[in-house]
């Protein structure tokens, strides 16, 4: 007889990883254990924000995480930190909550750099090594229980649609069931139309959604300075979990008001356009920002940096600082002579480390309220999203208790991320039982959605 049995939280967290990768278990309780999967939503005023699946979409539960962006994976002065030791050192010494893996993409991305005997070229010129660089960072982030952005670091991704789909399909298949992972499908579009970005993003997001409902980040025209371009013309996302990026460099860009050029929306400050997008209900994410000039140079202006930090904190905007590298640029965080186990900070690095010092020093794992039951069917409710409905197991069936009627989608996934059962229907309020006795022995993830409300449980059938 098959019995879904209770398993430990550490185990079930790891079970949703794809079988393509070794099971990865966190070595500590960090921000991912506390907040869960990052997800978009609106507050009671209709403002777009980022939330965590543990508390769900509600006022006061907005999530802001802050950390570092690795430099483009083309320079040996950067690759020292594309390592497990490099990520762990930044967690311990800088208190980062998130890291961004800015992967070079084009075959023509070749700056003649060499690291550990590898000629550094973009993904289209060296799929194996670039993919492995990203995997190393992702797995280090999971072990450290921090978030990780997988960044297709391109200025012309709309010309690389098939390559991006291939890459993100592999990443979603392998890591898409880890709450740590965020997919950034287009780093910085240049001066092209939003429609070109949107059409590209629609295709890549669809590829990701075959295997993962994790947060997706989408860039926008003029180097991610126009998230408001997407208002009323958002990308298509079956999981409704896409945010729009805002990039800024403190010496060059302004956080409020306008430049005074008298050119309509093009005149508005980058921060103003970000706020406009949020007020229209779009979630915004600062996946890259620098302390200096927009070209990466310059000495950080302390006052302008402080104003931008106040802007980000006011709007609960998550960010990754450019860059965790020893590149000879004013925005590089580390001095020459630093290593993956020992960091010596530049002016920029010390400034950013100061901001990161206010991140929490400890975290509490999301509560797993395991109900007492004489039934052999018991599992952990992993996503504590709201009080509108509850999900449990009883007598070989999934039990749904709902206080409201509405369209409800029930999905059960195996370890590969394949859908093993799916049901979508309009359920009235009250109790409903869904038979799962046909599932073979194995480990599964059950997810139940009513609109933006989510419950998720991980269980094992023996």
Label the predicted regions.
Residues 27-48, 67, 72, 79, ...:
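Extracellular glycoside hydrolase catalytic/binding regions
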Residues 8-16:
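Bacterial N-terminal signal peptides
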Residues 82-155, 163-166, 208-209, 301-315:
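Aromatic-lined substrate-binding rim segments of carbohydrate-active enzymes
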Residues 379-462:
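C-terminal outer-membrane/trafficking sorting elements
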Residues 17-21:
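Sec/Tat signal peptide C-region and signal peptidase I cleavage site
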Residues 1-9:
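Bacterial N-terminal signal peptides that target proteins for export
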Residues 22-27, 359-386:
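Low-complexity, Pro/Thr/Ser/Gly/Ala-rich linker/spacer regions in secreted
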Residues 24-114:
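N-terminal structural segment of carbohydrate-active enzymes
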